[in-house]
Amino acid sequence: MSQGFIEFPNIDPVLIELGPISVRWYGLMYLVGFMFALWLANRRADQPDSGWTREQVSDLLFAGFLGVVLGGRIGYVLFYNFGLFIDDPLYLFKVWTGGMSFHGGLLGVITAMLWYAKKNGRTFFGVADMIAPLVPFGLGMGRMGNFMNSELWGRVTDVPWAIVFPNGGPLPRHPSQLYEMALEGIVLFFILNWFIKKPRPLGSVSGLFLAGYGTFRFLVEYVREPDAQLGLFGGFISMGQILSLPMVIIGVLMMVWAYKRGHYKDELPQQTK
């Protein structure tokens, strides 16, 4: 290889093996993301007049977690491997083969939030604005897990920080997982948690999340290797970009609608404490 490129560090994707049970770095990253979200949600619930209790945010995050797992798997199969699913419907349940989709997970979380809001007498946007700032850190941890698994790497490049991934061929590639970790995880986290400290109407936080994530993901897709089974649609746009563009549009429209509507207080159930 040409000098100046970085060889992928020798990282064993398995952290610990306990008999037949393997604890993987990828799973640990998601666990860290979930625990951080729970800690942050509890801090927000403890604030005066938050309208939330620790028990309520725990129930919400548990519902959201189920939505992420179920929606992420179903979305991956339908968006990225639909042909394989048609040939083998049981592929949907073969989770050990890997495969999760953020956009599918998002739809799963939206479904979970709709259910939670209806069950607990809350507004959907009140629930969505609560959970949106908790998500980016977990996304960042997930991208770190992708990097440690040497998967979802970027396109071939000659930038000085390019990395030769063990299962990405002999040529150096963009570490697109780290780009996504930085943008979707760190930058979006600070943007949202700065924004919620200001007076803002209901729906604006979740709208900003959709617009922010969609923008960052759309941009990174230009240096991320397209899925081998799909390639580029029309030779210029990836499935990730097709799914992210509506997020940007919907997110911007939500923010415009939220500010025009001007509702700054959520309608809370009678007893929240």
UniProtKB/Swiss-Prot annotation:
Instruction: Give any Gene Ontology cellular component.
Output: plasma membrane
Q: Which HAMAP family match?
A: Lgt (MF_01147)
Key word Transferase present in the record?
Answer: yes
Name of the protein described by the UniProt record: Phosphatidylglycerol--prolipoprotein diacylglyceryl transferase
Task: Name the InterPro entries on file.
Answer: Lgt
The pathway entry for this protein reads as: Protein modification; lipoprotein biosynthesis (diacylglyceryl transfer)
Where is it mostly found?
membrane
Pfam families, sorted: LGT (PF01790)
